[in-house]
Design a protein with these regions (language model features):
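Single conserved hydrophobic/aromatic residue that forms the stacking wall/gate
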Residues: 2-13
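ATP-dependent small-molecule kinase catalytic core of the GHMP/sugar-kinase superfamily
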Residues: 14-137, 150-183
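Catalytic nucleophile-His microenvironment captured as a short glycine-rich beta-strand/loop
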Residues: 147
């Protein structure tokens, strides 16, 4: 009986979570991801999510410059036919499964950078600053302007955090780590 109840509660939880995700997309494309948690492949406008194995644990430096970027502007000006940056998603998924941080960093990419960076060069400056301070990879998140850098050790990440704060390239700077918790 207890097992049946537990299974029943688990089914209710999964159904409620799915409903929350469906409703959440009406608020914003990122909401379903926040509800789902963990590593996922996002498709469409970010609302179609497929769970992936957990990302390798690593320090992450996040930097947001003192600018705002219109997501609408970025998508209106995105010309996929003219874009040479096309991340190999299948290879990146294999890198995530293999938990190879350096390969993940080498194969990650964001086509939206082709629109955002020419209009807001500080984003590229932040990426270069992270890389020159030890990040194994740095990329703009979504349509921007926030940039994240992946590090393979805590000490390097802490030094990069201090360097980013003193550079004044970003108004908000955070040092965190990959969080893998999916229930």
């Amino acid at each position: 009986r207890d097992t049946d109840r537990s299974r029943g509660l688990g089914d209710v939880y999964k159904r409620q979570k799915r409903q929350l995700m469906e409703r959440g997309v009406q608020i914003g494309a990122d909401v379903p991801y926040c509800i789902m948690r963990g590593t996922a492949l996002a498709e469409g406008i970010g609302e179609a999510l497929s769970p992936l194995p957990p990302m390798v644990k690593c320090p992450v430096l996040i930097a947001k410059p003192s600018i705002s970027v219109s997501t609408k502007f970025v998508y209106q000006n995105l010309k996929l036919d003219d874009t040479t940056i096309h991340p190999d998603i299948d290879r990146l998924i294999d890198d995530i499964k293999a938990k190879n941080l350096h390969d993940i960093a080498a194969h990650m990419g964001n086509v939206l950078e082709t629109v955002t960076i020419p209009n807001y060069p500080v984003i590229d400056e932040i990426k270069k600053h992270m890389l020159s301070n030890g990040a194994v990879g740095a990329m703009m998140s979504g349509s921007g302007p926030t940039v994240f850098g992946l590090f393979d050790d805590e000490d390097t990440a802490k030094k990069a955090y201090k360097a980013m704060r003193s550079s004044h390239l970003a108004r908000q700077v955070y040092l965190t780590s990959v969080y893998n918790n999916r229930k």
